[in-house]
């Protein structure tokens, strides 16, 4: 059994993680924080979550249980300062922010418009996509959970296996997200459900912080000096879910059936589902689940991949729970199936 402390448990991903943890009995939530909700019980704030009614929100500065695994569901600037403190105190840490994903400080500070004062800790973090880095995650003390958009693009491309060596240095990714994937709590009405009702628009064109993350992890060790990723996110008039369309070219037209390659890559993966046609991919198949659905179609040397996931689960809290399970030697699927 692992004891879990969640900083930022009152936010969207923090609440989702609490819901997932309530489905299992191996891990115990012993400490939750929210500066806005400090002093309130979990039962007062989220009566639908069946945890002990005396579990109470603390401020972020409150001392946490010494043996607990710490999950940071807080803004980037808070994670930058908090993660090193907890690591140096002997805690295992999972960070859901983007603070420790990128390995180039200049690129990070441009993408996030934020000075990184603890950049030496980036190299201590394992990028938390279990289907790619499972063995490293089993021995990790510090995990940087991937972005929701990033997961929907990086993982499908990675699963192409031997075809990745033939990638041309340009990928176009077009992603549509529910409002909870784009700052659902912001006071900007344009990012609220009422702001997107009967509406549809792009945002952060050529400036979204997940674009360099996608670029770094898709082209890692490729030898390509200047690969290009063009990533465009859009806001859908729905609450949760991401559907991504990824267009890439290979330097050859002679290669194996990409559906067969994906199926072979995923044959032992509990949360990856390969569908026969891209038209079958849709949000309702993945909402409220930890599944990532993928399909692909080939024309000449061009591949069009379509993927879908729930941004709050496989794109955030569910993937974090996969990582908690791996880091603590627990069955990976624990808490992730109803």
Curated annotation (Swiss-Prot):
Coiled-coil intervals: none
Pathway per the UniProt entry: Amino-acid biosynthesis; L-arginine biosynthesis; N(2)-acetyl-L-ornithine from L-glutamate: step 3/4
GO molecular function, one term: N-acetyl-gamma-glutamyl-phosphate reductase activity
Annotated GO CC locations: cytoplasm
GO biological process, one term: L-arginine biosynthetic process
Catalytic residues of the enzyme: 148
Stated role: Catalyzes the NADPH-dependent reduction of N-acetyl-5-glutamyl phosphate to yield N-acetyl-L-glutamate 5-semialdehyde.
Protein name listed in UniProt: N-acetyl-gamma-glutamyl-phosphate reductase
């Amino acid at each position: 059994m692992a004891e879990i402390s969640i900083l930022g448990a009152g936010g969207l991903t923090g609440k989702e993680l609490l819901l997932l943890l309530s489905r299992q009995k191996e891990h115990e939530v012993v400490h939750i924080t929210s500066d806005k909700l400090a002093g309130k019980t979990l039962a007062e704030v989220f009566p639908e979550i069946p945890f002990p009614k005396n579990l109470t929100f603390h401020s972020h500065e409150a001392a946490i249980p010494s043996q607990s695994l710490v999950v940071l569901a807080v803004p980037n600037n808070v994670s930058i300062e908090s993660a090193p403190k907890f690591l140096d105190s002997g805690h295992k840490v999972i960070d859901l922010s983007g603070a420790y994903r990128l390995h180039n400080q200049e690129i990070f500070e441009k993408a996030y418009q934020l000075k990184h004062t603890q950049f030496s800790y980036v190299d201590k973090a394992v990028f938390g996509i279990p289907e790619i880095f499972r063995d490293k995650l089993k021995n990790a003390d510090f995990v940087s959970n991937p972005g929701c958009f990033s997961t929907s693009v990086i993982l499908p491309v990675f699963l192409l296996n031997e075809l990745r060596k033939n990638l041309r240095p340009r990928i176009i990714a077009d992603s549509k997200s529910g409002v909870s994937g784009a700052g659902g709590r912001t006071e900007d009405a344009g990012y609220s459900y009422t702001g997107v009702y009967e509406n549809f628009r792009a945002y952060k064109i050529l400036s979204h912080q997940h674009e360099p993350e996608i670029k770094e992890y898709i082209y890692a060790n490729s030898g390509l000096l200047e690969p290009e990723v063009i990533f465009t996110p859009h806001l859908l008039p729905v609450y949760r879910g991401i559907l991504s369309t990824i267009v890439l070219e290979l330097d050859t037209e002679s290669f194996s059936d990409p559906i067969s390659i994906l199926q072979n890559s995923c044959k032992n993966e509990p949360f990856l589902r390969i569908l026969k046609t891209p038209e079958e991919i849709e949000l309702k198949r993945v909402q409220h689940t930890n599944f990532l659905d993928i399909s692909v179609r080939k024309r000449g040397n061009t591949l069009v991949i379509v993927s879908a996931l729930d941004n709050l689960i496989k794109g955030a809290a569910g993937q974090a729970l996969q990582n908690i399970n791996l880091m603590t030697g627990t069955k990976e699927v624990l808490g992730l199936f109803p």
